[in-house]
Amino acid sequence: MARSLVLGNGRFLINFDDFYRIRDVYYPHIGIENHTEGRPFRFGVWVDGATHWVDEVWEREIGYEEGTLVGRTVLRHRALGLELRCRDAVDFEADIFCRELEVRDLRGAARHVKVFLHHDFYISGSDV
């Protein structure tokens, strides 16, 4: 499967698929130890009493900020009336993955939204 977003610094590499799920985490040797074993890490929200994982229902715009290696993703769920704006990067010097997330309500109402990140690591090929 092709990767829609690739972020790395030569030692630490994170790849995202078409649904904005992390599919690969390589560290400290890119191409040798994939700490996900190719299994997706899910990303979703809890709103209005239910959890919604990012899937085919969400509209997705996945790309890079112009002239950078910073990922820029917009996720929209029309039925929920939510838009998520995400910026992702791997630091060039420190092996750190950073994510900035902005939640926008498209209905014009104040609502309580929780963000869920489901990470299922396989460190060095071991089910952790």
Where do the language-model regions lie?
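Terminal accessory carbohydrate-recognition/targeting modules of carbohydrate-active enzymes
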Residues: M1-V128
